[in-house]
Amino acid sequence: MAVNAKNWQELKKPNGLEKKSGGDGKRKATFVAEPLERGFGLTLGNSLRRVLLSSLQGAAVTSIKIENVLHEFSSLAGVREDVTDIVLNVKQIALKMQGDGPRRLQLSATGPAEVTAGMIAASGDIEVMNTDLVICHLDDGATLNMELTADVGKGYVTAAANRPVDAPIGLIPVDALYSPVRQVAYKVENTRVGQELDYDKLTLTIETDGTVTPEDALAYSARILQDQLQLFVHFDDGMAISAPAAGAGAAGGAAGEPEGDANQLNRYLLKKVDELELSVRSANCLKNDNIIYIGDLVQKTEAEMLRTPNFGRKSLNEIKEVLASMGLRLGMEIPGWPPENIEEMAKKLEQEF
């Protein structure tokens, strides 16, 4: 099957992702991507927003059990709020949980006191992010003993769905909002490329509950879309990028064949990573890992690169951006690489230029 790589390689791609933090950068940030082909701002913005709000994993309280309370329409002596108000406040607790649930949490307080989320006795793998959230107020001599059940999930789950079949008397299920993303807004504007104004500028504002940073939330949503869309790609990159065969010309094709898109990409594979104009740190890491040609580099996965000593996320993003400008990426499979006469082929290619 012949694959025309121009379908995706010749589309205009953003130069980079600009981040603008607003106030608390761990909770709210704005991202700008430009230039995009006309229509891609709306396509990407709407898709990312829907995934951000619906599909990210998080933790939430699913039920509570209060001592001496049989149902949510009860009231407690010495507690200013009724149980319904307490449930509404508990729903706003932001939890960061490592591992799977469900987990049990305890909250005990004696009045007079303002009971906050920070008073919850959490284990080492559970962290309450909004510790100043007020749950209720206790008068002098009043006591509150509450057991909370927390679990992990995605999206929004109603209290009815959180009620176990064998729920004991006094167990009050709670609506669970698992999504760590609280608000997402996007805006699409015109932007200039040279003298042309027919391109999109996507501005995406993300606000989270603090359990995940806006930058990570955006990365997770993009990865979800990437994983879902992979089903629709019925060819692999090897069909578009043919590895240079032994004895082939510098372009990697047979003698007399016209140079197509695959041949142009083969030229990139034969270039040395020294020609990528990377930062000194990134270049040294590649050199220490014995990565000489771009063909060697693109076969490495992100995980393999991050295991390289002194190689961090900043260097990884730099390399991914450079490869993307050539229509390449990490984690590619190139059958027959490296060719036996790679040095001769690379030298011949260098002489041509």
UniProtKB/Swiss-Prot annotation:
User: Which biological process annotations from GO are given for this protein?
Assistant: DNA-templated transcription
Q: Where is this region: Alpha N-terminal domain (alpha-NTD)?
A: 1-236
Keyword Transferase, does the record have it? Answer: yes
The region called Disordered is annotated at 1-26
Coiled-coil stretches noted in the UniProt entry, renumbered to this chain = none
Give the domain of life.
Bacteria
Keyword tags: DNA-directed RNA polymerase, Nucleotidyltransferase, Transcription, Transferase
Q: Where is this region: Alpha C-terminal domain (alpha-CTD)?
A: 265-353
- Enzyme type, top EC level: transferase
| GO cellular component, as recorded | cytoplasm; DNA-directed RNA polymerase complex
Family named by the database record: Belongs to the RNA polymerase alpha chain family.
Quaternary data: Homodimer. The RNAP catalytic core consists of 2 alpha, 1 beta, 1 beta' and 1 omega subunit. When a sigma factor is associated with the core the holoenzyme is formed, which can initiate transcription.
Q: Which HAMAP family match?
A: RNApol_bact_RpoA
What is the designated name of this protein? Answer: DNA-directed RNA polymerase subunit alpha
Tell me what organism the protein belongs to.
Rhizorhabdus wittichii (strain DSM 6014 / CCUG 31198 / JCM 15750 / NBRC 105917 / EY 4224 / RW1)
The encoding gene: rpoA
